[in-house]
Amino acid sequence: MIQNGGTVSQGSVLCYACQIPAKVAVSSIRSFWGHSLENKPRGMTFTDMSATSSLLLSGGQNFLSRTIPVLPTLHKSSTTPRATKDSSGFRFPPMTKKPRWWWRTLSCIPYLLPFHQAWMYARTAYHLHPFIPYFQPMTYPFLMAIGTLPRWSLIAYFLIAYLTIVRRKEWPHFFRFHVAVGMLIEIALQVTGIVSRWMPRSFYWGKLGMHFWTTAFFVFLFTTIECIRCALVGMYADVPFVCDAAYIQIPHE
């Protein structure tokens, strides 16, 4: 700031402004705001502006405390958080009426493949060798027919059944569900057979392998029989883990 050819620092200007009486400051502010508000049609009135400036210059802390809003204090809740019931699990659609007999019969067809292939594991279980000759004639023709097909036939079966039946809403939900469950059981059988080839010979032909294949045979056999029973009576087969995976594959209605 240059005044009469001399320089004045900002600190001296502030000190000089602090020494100005309140009345002189108010009058200067009034003249400044009055000149600036002449050209404005709307806004604060001159009396409101002068009252505000006088309160601010006179150190009206009570005015500021009344104008500044005070946020309400937050009280801690005395209630403790509780776990809610998990609703992420699936629910079977309500069965308003029993499915037609042809839908129940068609729902049993996907279980024929895992039912017959489960007998292949019975050959490894020595405990079941005396019973194989009695049941082998019932499964041998079907397995021979499957063996005559090309290798890619099972892959084509899974792709066609999944894309044309499981994923299509035109088919009944009951039928699509059993097709998906039958495919998953067959995949579990195939994975078990592939993994068994990586095991050492001592495990595959030893005493531990004998008990393992006996258990695997009964698990797959009775699971497939239970699914066939549920399909014939018009029910959803409640197989652990398999039902969850099958229900996820079916689009929502």
From Swiss-Prot:
Keywords: Chloroplast, Membrane, Plastid, Plastid inner membrane, Protein transport, Transit peptide, Transmembrane, Transmembrane helix, Transport
UniProt GO cellular component terms: chloroplast inner membrane
Subcellular location: Plastid, Chloroplast inner membrane
Stated induction or repression of this protein's expression: Down-regulated by heat.
Principal localisation: plastid
Domain of life: Eukaryota
Transit peptide: 1-82
Biological processes per GO annotation: protein transport
Keyword Iron on entry: no
InterPro entries per UniProt: Tic20
Keyword Lipid metabolism (UniProt): no
Membrane topology qualifier: Multi-pass membrane protein
Stretches that traverse the bilayer: 101-120, 142-162, 174-194, 208-228
Family as reported in the entry's similarity comment: Belongs to the Tic20 family.
NCBIfam families linked: 3a0901s05TIC20
Subunit structure: Part of the Tic complex. Interacts with TIC22 and with the Toc complex.
Its job: Involved in protein precursor import into chloroplasts. May be part of an intermediate translocation complex acting as a protein-conducting channel at the inner envelope. Seems to be specific for photosynthesis-related pre-proteins.
Protein name: Protein TIC 20, chloroplastic
